[in-house]
């Protein structure tokens, strides 16, 4: 579990989301599933507006830049995250028509 610290795109207030993650080399990977809801989670919109954020893993705080994975990279990371989460992301995807984004958090 990691803590993602963003700034609200409208309120400019600090926001924190606790998210499951997988590692990909030095990067951290999170999935904007929102349990298969029809809309993206708020933290995803905040990342799109301001991709330079901070995460906390255990006691370590890390400055990262977020980006949405695409193509082959997305497929590979989706499969890895879904396996770690015991097929839940595939279940969530079956509940919604929106493509669920896979976000890469690259340390700066």
Regions inferred by a protein language model and the residue ranges of each:
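Short beta-strand segments
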Residues: 1-35
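Short, structured beta-strand-loop surface elements
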Residues: 34-86, 93-101, 107-108
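Short, acidic/polar N-cap/turn motifs at the starts of alpha helices
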Residues: 1, 18, 50-52, 89
